[in-house]
């Protein structure tokens, strides 16, 4: 979908989500997004 946004921003989020889901929870809470869909924050 958004390959550019995915390569630049979501890549670090996906990596953190795969390695440390709790880190993503904190990051997503700041952006008011659910940690279940870390890639949606970039698409939306």
Swiss-Prot record:
Localization recorded for this chain is:
Secreted
The SS bond pairs are: none
Signal sequence segment: none
Q: Which GO terms describe its cellular component?
A: cytosol; extracellular region; nucleus
Q: Where is the lipid attached (S-farnesyl cysteine)?
A: 41
Q: Which GO MF terms are attached to this record?
A: mating pheromone activity
Q: What keywords sit in the KW lines?
A: Lipoprotein, Methylation, Pheromone, Prenylation, Secreted, Stress response
Query: Quick one: a GO biological-process term for this protein?
Result: cell-cell signaling
Question: What induces or represses its expression, per the UniProt entry?
Answer: By nitrogen starvation. It is further induced by a pheromone signal. Its transcription is limited to M cells.
Where does it mainly reside?
Answer: secreted
Spell out the residue numbers of the propeptide. 1-32, 42-44
Q: What does this protein do?
A: M-factor is a mating pheromone produced by M-type mating cells. All three mfm genes contribute to the production of M-factor.
The protein in question is named M-factor
| Record organism | Schizosaccharomyces pombe (strain 972 / ATCC 24843) (Fission yeast)
Q: What taxonomic ancestry is recorded?
A: Eukaryota, Fungi, Dikarya, Ascomycota, Taphrinomycotina
